[in-house]
Amino acid sequence: MDRREQKTQQAIRNAFLALRAHKPLERITVKELAENAQISKATFYLHYHDIYELSEALQEDVIQQILSSITQADLFVKDAPAFTRELFASFFAHQHLIDILFSGTQASVLPIRIEQGIREHIFAIVPERRDDAAFNIRLTYQVQGAYYAYSENQRRFGPDAVLAELDGITRSLYA
């Protein structure tokens, strides 16, 4: 990708994030985005099929950043409390983008995609866990349950208090 294409991509992404911060995904139009990015609609369509594809691409970027922040792909298997701390530290570091990209009708996308990504990492390393019911249920419970507990309570009680409680819950699960 040459420098012009990179600048256009960045303008599209910045315009989308600015619009998405104030509007539901379903109400953003290509025309409005193109005007804000100072590009033509045709230029937008050279890069993305529609607004939803752009949104998914930005969501995927955030998800990959979160997953790559986990120091060891098999940390969930080795040390579940440490895994929880790393995962939620990454959520906190990306909170601004999470609030924009995963709000409204997109709220459930993040924990589902994070869980899928973690499963892929774990099963590549420890394939025998794929059919382990207890392991799979705990993974879903830990990722989905902890995510919703965090997102519902972190603003009220602060991320440190929520993470400390999640750490205690995780430790009791594996005691």
State the predicted function of each range:
Residues 29-30, 58-71:
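Short, basic, alpha-helical segments at the C-terminal edge of helix-turn-helix-like DNA-binding modules
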Residues 105-140, 144, 171:
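Amphipathic alpha-helical packing segments from all-alpha helical-bundle domains
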